[in-house]
Amino acid sequence: MPLLKVAKLLWAAPCSAVGLLFAAVPLSFGGKGAWRHGALEVTYRRNQASCGKLAHALPFRGIVFGHVILAVTDEELFHIGPHERVHVEQYERWGPLFFLAYPLSSLWQILHGRSPYWDNHFEIQARHRSTDVHREGGGV
């Protein structure tokens, strides 16, 4: 493994550790995980029909902590995977500082009357870069 990749894994490792703690929940209830595209992708169920009420009530369909991508279903991961992998790259760049930078970007947006999610710098970048990946024929 190239030294730079090892450095990125180590730099994001504290965030990935948090992701592993959260991943234990779906995995303990029959979810599945696999290392793909440079991250551990964990899903709870194959599709929405097989999810319970709690999974439907979650305020997100996918979330990333370091090199751990958590998605509710395989179907959703297929659609949001490119976007979430941009967040993995952001964790590789920012490391543990991402846990501070992301909410600060959201706070900045709120203070300027904008959406803390849609106008967050990291979300804008993820939407833009994941759209480019799909246009170029990359992605999932």
Regions found by a protein language model. Give the residues of each.
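Hydrophobic alpha-helical transmembrane segments and immediately flanking/interface helices
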Residues: 80-84, 90, 116-119
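Catalytic Zn2+-binding segment of zinc metalloproteases
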Residues: 85-101
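Residue-level detector of flexible, active-site-proximal loop/helix-junction positions
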Residues: 76, 95, 133
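Metalloprotease/metallohydrolase-associated module, dominated by Zn2+-dependent proteases
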Residues: 1-60, 98-140
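Short pre-active-site segment immediately N-terminal to the catalytic Zn-binding motif
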Residues: 57-82, 92
